[in-house]
């Protein structure tokens, strides 16, 4: 069977994390009542004029810097002209001729341990279109999304398989999330992925027609779409047929790509400069200031967690899978020096609760202060690790009491006073005289039994190390 070289390019549309839209003051909020967040500018009323959202430009600069791009200091916009119901003006404001970012790169770590640099062609700013909802042979339009700020990030056609495409989008998502450029929720459409896929026989310098797959909304769907489309195109080429230039979509139910439309000729969008937005000169000092305030990226945190805080790579990676968990961890380690204990508790019992309730850590009652208090009390030998089974369910669901108040109310403090422990042992020793006779031959069994009775009598509130020493001493004194 003939082997083919796979050529993949990735385009990502990323909704910017701004309070207002790209060219209007309308509020940006997901899940609101349809058509309640669109003003005269968004709906293209005659006489309305756009104004550039400064915050959106800042976020675009941050993204360009993180992706090692050349940042253009002259900000200009263009009109992309076409008619479609989701585009009220009859054109989209974008950056065709002069994107804010060019010639970037992003390194990904492959599963075989090798690394690959993905070349990025451009990053440009534009506005989103209205959302289309298809139902019962009708199409509804929600203009709440119309005009929301976007950045589009386009790679060069340098990816070669589904693994690379998935790893690239995952890494891009992580960077944009930790930069606070976007919430990158693929299921909500704030990170949308388009793929351009073509095949050619190895050794050929001619590309076959590319097929575009639109609006992939999960990493798993990216993988499935790439694998299906590669096989589909292979079958066509092996029959000596021509792959038609098409736009397709991925269908979850059939696990296949479905034809949306064929592309016989490329569409002429009649691009020209946006006359209502004058060119804006971005001062180099302003760009430098924006970059200097860039949040710490996940890769930087990963190095710090392992090298400075002593976490394992595995624990660091689990913490960093969620921005909410990472922020919680950062706040907690400011209140305690037992960084490993914080990580272990977050990724075990706390994560188990989050998984059970399908929540993020900022959606439950647990506070960094209370988690740090539990760890500090254990480290100071005021409570035992066993007592966390009593305390944690309370502080996970309520923040009305401090941990110290809970410990006091439930009498959970460890008994560490030797005289007090000795007094508690008197009755236990007296009730187990026959057992003590076995001590010379079976010392471990005797100690374990006496310790068990002591723990039962005190509800486990005795320091085990101190108690063990006193138990041995008391037994030997009563032989």
Swiss-Prot record:
Protein name: Aspartyl/glutamyl-tRNA(Asn/Gln) amidotransferase subunit B
Gene Ontology annotations of biological process type: glutaminyl-tRNAGln biosynthesis via transamidation; translation
Record InterPro entries: Asn/Gln-tRNA_amidoTrfase_suB/E, Asn/Gln-tRNA_Trfase_suB/E_cat, Asn/Gln_amidotransferase, Asn/Gln_tRNA_amidoTrase-B-like, GatB, GatB_C_1, GatB_Yqey_C_2, Gln-tRNA_amidoTrfase_suB_CS
GO molecular function: asparaginyl-tRNA synthase (glutamine-hydrolyzing) activity; ATP binding; glutaminyl-tRNA synthase (glutamine-hydrolyzing) activity
The species this protein was found in: Mycoplasma capricolum subsp. capricolum (strain California kid / ATCC 27343 / NCTC 10154)
Source domain of life: Bacteria
Annotated family: Belongs to the GatB/GatE family. GatB subfamily.
TM regions (residue ranges): none
Reaction equations catalysed: L-glutamyl-tRNA(Gln) + L-glutamine + ATP + H2O = L-glutaminyl-tRNA(Gln) + L-glutamate + ADP + phosphate + H(+); L-aspartyl-tRNA(Asn) + L-glutamine + ATP + H2O = L-asparaginyl-tRNA(Asn) + L-glutamate + ADP + phosphate + 2 H(+)
Root EC class: ligase
This protein's UniProt keywords: ATP-binding, Ligase, Nucleotide-binding, Protein biosynthesis
Gene responsible for this protein: gatB
The protein's role, per its UniProt record: Allows the formation of correctly charged Asn-tRNA(Asn) or Gln-tRNA(Gln) through the transamidation of misacylated Asp-tRNA(Asn) or Glu-tRNA(Gln) in organisms which lack either or both of asparaginyl-tRNA or glutaminyl-tRNA synthetases. The reaction takes place in the presence of glutamine and ATP through an activated phospho-Asp-tRNA(Asn) or phospho-Glu-tRNA(Gln).
């Amino acid at each position: 069977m003939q082997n083919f070289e796979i050529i993949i390019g990735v385009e990502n549309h990323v909704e910017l994390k701004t309070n207002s839209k790209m060219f209007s003051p309308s509020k940006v909020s997901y899940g609101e009542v349809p058509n309640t967040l669109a003003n005269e500018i968004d709906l293209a009323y005659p006489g309305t004029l756009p104004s550039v959202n400064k915050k959106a430009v800042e976020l675009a600069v941050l993204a360009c810097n993180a992706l090692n791009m050349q940042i253009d200091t002259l900000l200009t916009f263009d009109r992309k002209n076409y008619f479609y119901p989701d585009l009220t003006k009859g054109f989209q404001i974008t950056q065709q001729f002069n994107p804010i970012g060019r010639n970037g790169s992003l390194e990904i770590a492959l599963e075989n341990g090798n690394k690959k640099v993905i070349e990025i062609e451009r990053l440009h700013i534009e506005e989103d279109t209205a959302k289309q909802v298809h139902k019962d042979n009708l199409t509804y339009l929600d203009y709440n999304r119309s005009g929301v700020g976007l950045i589009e990030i386009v790679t060069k056609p340098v990816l070669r398989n589904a693994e690379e495409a998935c790893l690239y989008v995952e890494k891009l998502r992580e960077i944009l999330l930790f930069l606070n450029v976007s919430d990158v929720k693929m299921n909500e459409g704030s990170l949308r992925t388009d793929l351009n896929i073509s095949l050619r026989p190895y050794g050929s310098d001619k590309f076959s027609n590319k097929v575009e797959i639109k609006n992939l909304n999960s990493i798993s769907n990216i993988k499935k779409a790439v694998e299906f489309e590669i096989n589909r195109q292979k079958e066509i080429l092996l029959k000596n047929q021509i792959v038609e230039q098409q736009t397709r979509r991925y269908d979850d139910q059939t696990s296949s790509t479905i034809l949306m439309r064929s592309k016989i000729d490329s569409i002429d969008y009649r691009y020209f400069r946006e006359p209502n937005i004058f060119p804006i000169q971005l001062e180099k000092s302003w760009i430098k200031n924006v970059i200097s305030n860039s949040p710490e990226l996940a890769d930087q945190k990963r190095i710090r967690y392992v090298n400075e805080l002593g976490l394992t790579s595995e624990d660091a990676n689990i913490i960093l899978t969620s921005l909410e968990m990472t922020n919680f961890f950062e706040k907690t380690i400011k209140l305690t020096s037992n960084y490993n204990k914080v990580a272990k508790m977050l990724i075990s019992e706390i994560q188990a609760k989050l998984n059970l309730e399908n929540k993020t850590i900022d959606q439950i009652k647990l506070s960094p202060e209370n988690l740090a208090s539990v760890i500090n009390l254990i480290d100071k030998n005021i409570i035992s690790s066993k007592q966390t089974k009593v305390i944690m369910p309370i502080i996970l669901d309520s923040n009305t009491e401090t941990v110290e108040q809970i410990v006091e109310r439930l009498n959970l403090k460890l008994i560490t006073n030797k005289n007090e422990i000795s007094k508690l042992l008197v009755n236990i020793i007296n009730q187990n005289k026959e057992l003590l006779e076995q001590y010379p031959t079976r010392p471990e069994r005797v100690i374990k039994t006496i310790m068990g009775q002591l723990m039962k009598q005190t509800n486990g509130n005795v320091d085990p190390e101190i108690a063990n020493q006193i138990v041995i001493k008391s037994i030997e004194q009563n032989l």
